[in-house]
Design a protein with these regions (language model features):
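Conserved beta-strand-loop-alpha-helix hinge in the C-terminal portion
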Residues: 143, 148, 152, 156-178
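Walker B motif beta-strand of ABC-family P-loop ATPases
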Residues: 98-104
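ABC-family P-loop ATPase nucleotide-binding domains
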Residues: 25-98
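Helical segment within the ABC ATPase nucleotide-binding domain
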Residues: 114-127
């Protein structure tokens, strides 16, 4: 592998990395579709026409069950927590990274939002992509089936396993690791 920890964020994105934030910021005046056009153009170094991009975004929105006007809203402005997370998954779908880090994507979601986000990520999952899903709860893993589960304490892996480890954590908690 190649150490990219010192690379600027835009270079990491060009290499195929994506980070879904726990608390995505809002950017007034920038529409989702414009942000996606700029990001995709920079990552792929290809200029998309507005029509090409709108078709690509519309396809992803349909796949994720988002309304047609969603892409014309300002980036996370006035969004509920669930809408912010859905927007992150839309970005994930359109930008199509090789590796996605989903940092507590289930944080603040109600049952319906959790289902939309979980199923959205699950639909995007393929064998040639990697997903690092950070969560404290089993409920997200009912939709996103992990290949591996790791428990981190102070930045180090202290136990690894399969889905059964997440089920154990749901029942017993993290106390034995602290």
């Amino acid at each position: 592998g190649e150490d990219i920890t010192e690379e600027p964020v835009d270079n990491r994105a060009k290499l195929g990395m994506f980070l879904a934030f726990q608390y995505p910021e809002s950017i007034p005046g920038v529409t989702i579709v414009n942000m996606l056009k700029t990001a995709l153009t920079n990552i792929e170094e290809t200029e998309y026409t507005t029509l090409e991009l709108r078709l690509k975004v519309a396809e992803a929105m349909e796949q994720l069950g988002l309304s047609a006007d969603f892409a014309d809203r300002y980036l996370n402005e006035g969004f509920s927590g669930g809408e912010r997370k859905r927007n992150e998954i839309l970005q994930l779908a359109v930008l199509n990274p090789k590796l996605a880090v989903l940092d507590e994507t289930d944080s603040g979601l109600d049952v319906d939002g959790l289902k939309v986000v979980g199923e959205g990520v699950s639909k995007l999952k393929t064998d040639d992509k990697g997903y690092l899903v950070v969560t404290h709860y089993q409920r997200l893993l009912e939709y996103i089936k992990p290949d591996f589960v790791h428990v981190f304490v102070d930045g180090a892996i202290v136990e690894s396993g399969g889905v059964e480890l997440s089920e154990k954590l749901e029942k017993e908690g993290y106390e034995s690791y602290l």
